[in-house]
Amino acid sequence: MVSLGGLARKIFGSSNERRVRALQPRAEQIGALEKEMQALSDEALRGKTDEFRKKLADGADLDDLLVPAFAVVREAARRVLGLRPFDVQLIGGMVLHQGAIAEMKTGEGKTLVATLPVYLNALTGKGVHVVTVNDYLARRDAEWMGRVYGFLGLTTGVIVHGLSDEERRAAYACDVTYATNNELGFDYLRDNMKYERAQMVQRGHAYAIVDEVDSILVDEARTPLIISGPLDDRSELYNTIDTFILKLEPADYEVDEKQRTATFTEEGTEKVENLLREANLFKGDSLYDVENVAIVHHLNNALKAHRLFQRDKDYIVRNDEVIIIDEFTGRMMPGRRYSDGLHQALEAKEHVKIQPENQTLASITFQNYFRMYGKLAGMTGTASTEAEEFGNIYGLDVVEIPTNLPVSRIDEDDEVYRTVEEKYRAIVREIKEAREKGQPILVGTTSIEKSEYLAERLRKDGLKDFEILNARHHEREAYIVSQAGKPGAITIATNMAGRGTDIQLGGNADMRIHQELGDMPAGPERDAKEKAIREDVQRLKEKALAAGGLYVLATERHESRRIDNQLRGRSGRQGDPGRSKFFLSLQDDLMRIFGSDRMDGMLQKLGLKEDEAIVHPWINKALEKAQKKVEARNFDIRKNLLKYDDVMNDQRKVVFEQRIELMDGENLSETVAEMRQDVIDDLVERHIPANAYAEQWDAKGLKEGVLQYLNLDLPIDEWVKEEGIAEDDIRERITEAANKAAAERAERFGPDIMTYVEKSIVLQTLDHLWREHLVNLDHLRSVIGFRGYAQRDPLNEYKSEAFELFQAMLGNLRQAVTAQLMRVELVREAAEAPPPPAPPAMQAHHLDATTGEDEFANGDTMTLARADARIVPAEQRDPNDPSTWGKVGRNEACPCGSGKKYKHCHGTFA
C-alpha cells in the first residue's frame, strides 16, 4: 500500500526534484544564448567581464547576471579547455550560486561546474575561495580552471603549504583563490596574531565553494586547527607513566570501543596508586585528590594510547615520529598532533623522541571558520545522508543533481562470512576471477594494516602486479588512481584515498602523457607519441568496458554509509558499466561492536558451512540500521561539541575584532585613559567600600595597589586622616596624579613613539592574556562534565563560568596595560624615528624554562618601547625610580628593595 507521502511524491515529485525542475528554465535560457556567444571574438567574449562589472556598479543584482555570465563561462570553457558544461552542470552551478550543496556523482565534472558560480561571484571584486582537501588538488584545479578565468580577465591565486606571507597576500588579492581548508584556517588564525593591518594576508570571507564538502565540514568538523607554542620538557614523566601501563592486567581497566573510552577499575586504581608511590609521584590520600589532577590526566592518556590507538590504523611511525592517520581518508597528516599530551603518550608508547607539549596560542574549528563566510556552498558525490547536519549546523540545503547519463553500475548485496579468514579467502578468489576476464578492480579497505595484510595474501597467491594506495604512498596517489581503470588492474585503497581524481576506464591519457613524455619538446615526434598513447588508452577502455567496467570490491563496511557510498561511486562514472560488492565477516569491527552475536547464532542455525556466505537484502538493512545509529551518535557528538565551541567562538570574535580596531586606531590614548580610570575605580571600590566608615578603609592596601598598578607613591595614608574627606575625593586625587604622570610621559616620548608604544603593549598583553584564557577554558571544559552528577546542566555551567573567566581576563588586561604604560621608559640612541614593528606574536614570546611563564608577560613588555634595551648595574638603580632600573630579569630580586623576586613584586602586573 502506498503512503500518502509516497502518493504525493509520485504526483508532484520530491522537494529535490521540484527544486531542480525550477532551475531548468534558466538552463534553457543559457542554452538559447549559446550561438550568440559562439559568434563573439575572443576579445569581445573577454569584454563581457567589464560589461558585467559595470552593470553591478550601476545597481544590478548577481541573479540578474546569472544567465549571461553562465553562457559566457560555458563558451570560454569550450574554447580554452575543450569542455562544454552540460545542462545538469549548469543546474549544479546555480545551486552553488544559491549557497547550497550540490550532490553530484563521481565523474560528473564538479571541478568544471565550480567555474560558473565562481566567475559570477568574482565579478563583485570581493574574492572567491575554492576549497580543496589537499595541495595537489588546489594546484591542479587552479592551474586547470585558472585558464578559463584568465581568458575572461580574472586573476587566479593558489594557497599551498610553504608560501611566504607576501605570496599568500598576493594570492588572496586575486579574484579567485584556490586553497586547502587547513591553509585557510591557519592563515585566519595567524592574521589575528599580527601587529599591523598591512601584515595580514586574508581580505575577508565573502563566498566559498568547498569541494568534498562532506569530508571537510563533517569528517573534520571535530578537529580544531591549533597554533601552539612549546611548554617545558616532560619526557621523563611520560616515559615513567608509560611503564606503569605495561604492568597492568586486563582486569585493571575497562575499554569501551563504541564510546572510545578507557578507564581504570578499582583494582587498577589501587595498582596505579602503589606504582605512583614507588616513583614518588603520588600526593594526598587518593589518586583522585585535587593534587593529582595532572598525574591522572597523564595516566588516562597513556591508557588510551595503549588500548584505544592502534599503530598503522590511527597513526604510523616514520623517521622517529608518530604521524596521525586521518580515519576517514587514510591519509597521513604530518605536522598535526593530538593535543593535551595524548601525542606525547603515543610517542612514549612507541619509544620515539618525545616532542615538548604545546600551549594553545590560537584555535578554531572548521565549523566556526566556514560559518564566517557571507555565502557558503559545497560539492560532493555523497551528502544526502548528512543532510540534517548540513542544515542544522551550516544552514546548507543539499540538492541532488541528476547525472548527465543514467548510472548503469550494479550494486550487489553484501556477502557475509563467519570469520575474517573465510572472508579473505573469498576476496582473493573474487579478485582472481575478475582479473582473469580483464576487469579493473578497486579494493577498498578501512586501514593501512588491512590493506597491507591483503597485499601479502595476494602475493602468496601469485598475484604480484597490483598497486597499494594508502597513507604510506600518497605522493603517488593521483597517478595510481588515474590508471586504476586499466583492464585487469588491481588497486588496493584505504577508505577514500585519491578522492578528487577520477578513475577512467582504460586509464587517464593526459596523466600518462605527462608521466611518460614529461618535458619532451613540442614537435612532430611528441605529437606522434601523444597520439599513440591516446589510441592505446581508447583500446584499453574498450577492453575494460567489455569486461564489465570497474569492479569496486569492499572488504568491510565503514561506520558511515556515506563513506561506503563514496567507495561504490568510484565505479560507473558518466554512464559507464560497473559493479560493487561488500565482503564482510562477523568479526569485522562494525559487526563485532554493534551486536553480531544474534546474527552468529542465526547463521549457525541456518547450518552455514565453512567458506559459505549468506547473501540477503535483510543483512544489508540490518547493517544500514547499525550505521545509522553510529551516524546519529557522531552527529550528536559534533552538535554538542559545537555548542561548547560556540561559547569560545563568541569570545574569539570579540577579541579578534578588538585587535583589528586596535591595529586600525591612529590614537589609542583615549582607550588607554579609560582602562586607567577603570583600574583606579576598581582599586578605590576594593579598598574603600561604599558606605563604609573611614576607620574601615584599607588605606595601606590602596596605597600598595596604586604603587603596583600606577607606579605612583601617593600619601594616601595621610589623605584618609583629613577631616571630611570622601572616597570620591581620593578617587579624584589619584586620577589627577595618574593623568599628570601619563601626560608627562607622552610629552617626553612624542606622539609617534607614544602611539607605537601604546599599540604594542595593548596588543601583546591582549595576546598573552587570551592565550592564558584559552588554557583556562580547556581546563574548565575538561572538568565541567562532572557537574551533571550534581543535577546541573554542564553546558549552562560552562557558559556561565566561561563568561566569568572572560570578564576576569578583561579586568587583567586593563590592569596589565595600565601598569606597563605607567612604567615604560625609553633607553635609546636616537629619538627621531619610532622603533621597528614588533615581530609576530608566535616568535615574540619566550616561555621561562623553569616556571613556564611568559617572559614578556609583565616587566619585560616594557622593552618593546626601547630601541636599545640595556641591563643597568644594581648600584645605578634608584629603588624609588623604576625608570632607572633598565631591563630586569623575571627571577631577579626586585630593585625596589622589597626582598621579593621581581615577578612577585613590581613584575606582577599581568
Curated annotation (Swiss-Prot):
One of its GO terms (molecular function) is ATP binding. Its main location: membrane. Its EC number is 7.4.2.8. Keywords: ATP-binding, Cell inner membrane, Cell membrane, Cytoplasm, Membrane, Metal-binding, Nucleotide-binding, Protein transport, Translocase, Translocation, Transport, Zinc. SUPFAM superfamilies: Helical scaffold and wing domains of SecA (SSF81886), P-loop containing nucleoside triphosphate hydrolases (SSF52540), Pre-protein crosslinking domain of SecA (SSF81767). Its cofactor is Zn(2+). The keyword Magnesium does not apply. Zn(2+) binds at C894, C896, C905, H906. It is found in: Cell inner membrane; Cytoplasm. InterPro entries: Helicase_ATP-bd, Helicase_C-like, P-loop_NTPase, SEC_C_motif, SecA, SecA_CS, SecA_DEAD, SecA_motor_DEAD. It comes from the Bacteria. Coiled coil: none annotated. It is a peripheral membrane protein. May bind 1 zinc ion per subunit. It holds the Pfam family SecA_DEAD. GO terms for biological process: intracellular protein transmembrane transport; protein import; protein targeting; protein transport by the Sec complex. Monomer and homodimer. Part of the essential Sec protein translocation apparatus which comprises SecA, SecYEG and auxiliary proteins SecDF-YajC and YidC. Belongs to the SecA family. Part of the Sec protein translocase complex. Interacts with the SecYEG preprotein conducting channel. Has a central role in coupling the hydrolysis of ATP to the transfer of proteins into and across the cell membrane, serving both as a receptor for the preprotein-SecB complex and as an ATP-driven molecular motor driving the stepwise translocation of polypeptide chains across the membrane. NCBIfam families: PRK12904.1, secA. PANTHER family: CHLOROPLAST PROTEIN-TRANSPORTING ATPASE (PTHR30612:SF0), SECA INNER MEMBRANE COMPONENT OF SEC PROTEIN SECRETION SYSTEM (PTHR30612). This is Protein translocase subunit SecA. It comes from Chelativorans sp. (strain BNC1). The gene is secA.
